[in-house]
Design a protein with these regions (language model features):
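Accessory beta-strand-rich segments of carbohydrate-active enzymes
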Residues: 2-20, 28, 39-40, 54-58, ...
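Short, contiguous pre-domain boundary segments
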Residues: 25-37
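N-terminal helix-cap/turn-to-beta initiation motif at the start of protein domains
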Residues: 41-50
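A broad, low-specificity signal marking well-ordered, structured residues that form hydrophobic/aromatic
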Residues: 47, 76, 81, 126, ...
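Hydrophobic small-molecule pocket/channel-lining residues, especially in calycin-type beta-barrels
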Residues: 62, 80-81, 90, 96
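Short Gly/aromatic-enriched secondary-structure transition segments
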Residues: 64-77, 81-83
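Surface-exposed, low-complexity/disordered Ser/Thr/Gly/Pro/Asn-rich loops and linkers
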Residues: 90, 94-95, 99-118
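Short beta-strand segments of immunoglobulin-like
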Residues: 231-235
Length: 235
């Protein structure tokens, strides 16, 4: 898929678009010495995406910006927000707690469940933008974006092009950005997160309902020929 349809967030048949296959959680270091130290943040194959991003929050999903991912978009009036960070803990609305039942049922006037439909009203959307410079020596390698946990979904663009989409709030989402990034040059990363999507019907847990980016995000580089996944089969 070369462009987002913006129907993905309410389509139960679409859980991901262009998301890399799930795999065993490990990090590939550039040398035996680096692997022995086992601090990926020091690795030449690692680049953090944590830190300050330009950020815009809207109360209702139909008020979200739809062209913010374009190169040259003016975001000077936007807020600054670090990632990882949950919206409700940074002044964007308040946390809701629900022991049983979906959190949109706590909102007056929208109390019915109608899967896969979720509300437009009070369905907050956060939009993020940031320019980065990818190491020039990553040219010729595969470059993967890792988003540790994003609630409830993520639409991703790089340099004005749609990359992909993912749901599953508590699972990491990875995307191969090799064909989108320009190592050694400025690159625009933009993504958008909805408070609720159709996948929220599968996430009725007993806890405070927070939204945004909950875990570390980063880029990492891999050689073209590599071990992609590990499996252990017992006797």
């Amino acid at each position: 898929m070369d462009a987002q349809t913006f129907k993905e967030w309410q389509d139960p048949e679409i859980n991901a678009v262009n998301r890399a296959p799930m795999h065993t959680n490990f990090f590939a270091y550039e040398s035996t010495e680096a692997a022995t130290e086992a601090v990926k943040e020091k690795s030449a194959n690692f680049m953090t995406l944590n830190g300050i991003w330009k950020f815009r929050w809207v109360k209702d999903s139909d008020a979200r910006p739809t062209d913010f991912w374009k190169i040259g978009y003016n975001d000077k009036g936007w807020d600054d927000l670090p990632i990882p960070a949950m919206w409700e803990l940074n002044g964007y609305d308040v946390p809701l707690y629900s022991g049983v039942g979906f959190d949109w049922k706590l909102w007056k006037g929208w109390c019915k469940n109608n899967p896969p439909v979720v509300p437009v009203e009070n369905n907050h959307v956060g939009s993020y933008r940031r320019e980065i410079i990818v190491p020039s020596d990553w040219k010729g390698k595969d470059i993967i974006a890792h988003f540790g946990s994003v609630s409830s979904n993520i639409y991703l663009w790089v340099n004005g092009k749609f990359v992909g989409y993912s749901e599953d709030s508590k699972l990491e989402a990875e995307f191969n950005l090799t064909s989108y990034l320009k190592p050694g040059q400025k690159n625009l990363i933009a993504f958008q997160v909805f408070r609720w999507c159709d996948g929220s019907y599968l996430e009725d847990q007993d806890f405070f309902r927070y939204h945004g980016v909950a875990r570390d995000c980063y880029l990492y580089s891999r050689n073209k020929k590599r071990i992609e996944d590990l499996r252990v089969t017992p006797d």
